[in-house]
């Protein structure tokens, strides 16, 4: 595609994507706002008024912003591919005893794959979002780099580590050099109707934050109760289905042995949830798969990095080493709490995202 200045901005109806659209228009881009319709409750008539990024209120907010700043605006249907790539994945991972991150899957398959395809269909060279991240081209490496946002408290590079070089060429992150307070202040000064709208906190398609209920309603198999066992294999009691548990969990176990117990492993094949004491939740080695690298073409030798194993975690000193089949062995300098299969581990070199992958298992 020939390079041009047309950009599709993914508009969720929130302040970040709204200000992103405004900033790009001010920079001279031909801006088209798009809200992705990605999920609907089973009762199609019951359109949610509040909540997720495809709710009626979100569409109305995005349309009002588009009218205010003077850009074209469309709602596009992504329901089928969202169900396949995000919903089904989310449910299947829980059924396998893993804890998925649907936002990472949505970014990988929907926002920066499917939306980019739609953008190209309407002759737009770029896609932009309200993510707090920085994209730069490094002449020396001949690669695009993904770097942390100026506002480190809002940095979202953890959920963007899957981006490819082709995708990065066509992506814009207008908010990377701004702090959240500055974005809200700008929205307020512009009179944008979403200036004071709170940030979304929950997974957009789980309306009441009840993951178990959502999985039961969307699973293709029955959720069966099973056994709690300790790390030596001794029976402790019964659980209500592995979908209700995640590594490091303490609440809601219903088991009392005089000392606090935590989920330390989930054996989906045998429908067993393994419980242990606090020190048994920690580990310093893991293996990741489905790895993607951004600052380097591939991991060819041992490399010292900072790594983190969940979105809100602090980065920790670690060494990464390539394994067969594209997997990566990660050794932390210090034990980490609740290394959770299904979550992502992301590697950093200062402000630069080296890459990352999905946690397959804790080694020890």
Curated annotation (Swiss-Prot):
Q: What pairs make up the disulfide bonds?
A: 106-204
Under the heading SUPFAM superfamilies, the entry gives: Adenine nucleotide alpha hydrolases-like
* E.C. code: 2.8.1.13
In alphabetical order, the GO MF annotations are: ATP binding; tRNA binding; tRNA-uridine 2-sulfurtransferase activity
Q: Which reaction does it catalyse?
A: S-sulfanyl-L-cysteinyl-[protein] + uridine(34) in tRNA + AH2 + ATP = 2-thiouridine(34) in tRNA + L-cysteinyl-[protein] + A + AMP + diphosphate + H(+)
Keyword terms? ATP-binding, Cytoplasm, Disulfide bond, Nucleotide-binding, RNA-binding, Transferase, tRNA processing, tRNA-binding
* Positions annotated as active site in the UniProt record: 106 (nucleophile), 204 (cysteine persulfide intermediate)
Provide the top EC class: transferase
- Localization: Cytoplasm
- HAMAP family for this protein: tRNA_thiouridyl_MnmA (MF_00144)
Q: PANTHER family annotated for this entry?
A: MITOCHONDRIAL TRNA-SPECIFIC 2-THIOURIDYLASE 1, TRNA 5-METHYLAMINOMETHYL-2-THIOURIDYLATE -METHYLTRANSFERASE
Q: What protein is this chain from?
A: tRNA-specific 2-thiouridylase MnmA 1
Organism the protein comes from: Thermoanaerobacter sp. (strain X514)
């Amino acid at each position: 595609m020939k390079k041009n200045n047309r950009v599709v901005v993914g508009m969720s109806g929130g302040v970040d994507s709204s200000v992103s659209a405004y900033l790009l228009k001010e920079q001279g881009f031909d801006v088209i706002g798009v809200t992705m319709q990605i999920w609907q409750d089973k009762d199609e008539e019951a359109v949610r008024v509040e909540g997720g990024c495809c709710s009626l209120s979100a569409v109305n907010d995005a349309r009002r912003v588009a009218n205010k700043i003077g850009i074209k605006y469309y709602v596009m249907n992504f329901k089928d591919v969202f169900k396949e790539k995000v919903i089904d994945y989310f449910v299947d991972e829980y059924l396998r005893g893993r804890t998925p991150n649907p936002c990472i899957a949505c970014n990988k398959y929907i926002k920066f794959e499917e939306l980019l395809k739609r953008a190209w269909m309407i002759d737009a060279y770029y896609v932009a979002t309200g993510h707090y991240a920085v994209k730069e081209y490094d002449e020396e490496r001949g690669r695009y780099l993904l770097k942390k946002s100026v506002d480190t408290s809002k940095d979202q590079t953890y959920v963007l580590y899957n981006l490819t070089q082709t995708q990065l060429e066509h992506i814009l992150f207008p908010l990377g050099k701004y702090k959240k307070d500055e974005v809200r202040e700008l929205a307020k000064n512009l009179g944008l109707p979403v200036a004071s709208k709170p940030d979304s906190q929950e997974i957009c398609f789980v309306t009441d934050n009840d993951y178990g209920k959502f999985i039961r309603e969307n699973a293709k198999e029955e959720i069966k109760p099973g056994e709690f066992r300790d790390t030596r294999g001794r029976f402790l009691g019964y659980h209500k289905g592995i979908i209700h548990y995640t590594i490091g969990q303490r609440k809601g176990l219903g088991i009392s042995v005089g000392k606090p117990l935590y989920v330390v492993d989930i054996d989906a094949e045998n429908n067993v949830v393994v419980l242990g004491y606090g020190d048994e939740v920690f580990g310093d080695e893991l293996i990741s798969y489905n790895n993607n690298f951004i600052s380097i073409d591939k991991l060819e030798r041992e490399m010292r990095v900072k790594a983190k194993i969940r979105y809100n975690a602090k980065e920790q000193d670690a060494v990464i080493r390539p394994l067969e089949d594209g997997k990566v062995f990660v050794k932390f300098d210090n034990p980490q709490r609740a290394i959770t299969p299904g979550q992502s581990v992301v590697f950093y070199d200062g402000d630069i995202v080296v890459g990352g992958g999905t946690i397959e298992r804790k080694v020890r």
